[in-house]
Amino acid sequence: KIQSNTAENITKLTVELSETGYATLIFPYDKKESWKLLGWALDELSVDIEDRDQIEGSYFINVTPNKGFFSKLLSTASITKTYQLILKEDVNSQSRVIFVDLSEENDEKTISYSAELFDQIASKF
């Protein structure tokens, strides 16, 4: 976990569910700082990052069932799936990470996975 010398500086991330059920991760920082922290957390979780684009604010991640922590959530799939995490700064100088299922299937297991992934990221702080 990222630790701080004072209680005032503790990073507090929140996870919200959208109308579609997909999770959104909220960092209390600007886009640049949130980008660094998100990358660190993905590395800590050993998430397979296929590609990243800091200017766009996107991470493309690969999830392979039966491999590590996330295999339990997507156990029926037999191939690697790629998802996009898009980081956007809002007017309050907070940043939101939006989970995008590139297959657009809106599968219930994928929707649940978005919340589980973001909960795991938030637990790193």
What are these regions (language model features)?
Residues 1-125:
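Ser/Thr-rich, low-complexity intrinsically disordered terminal regions
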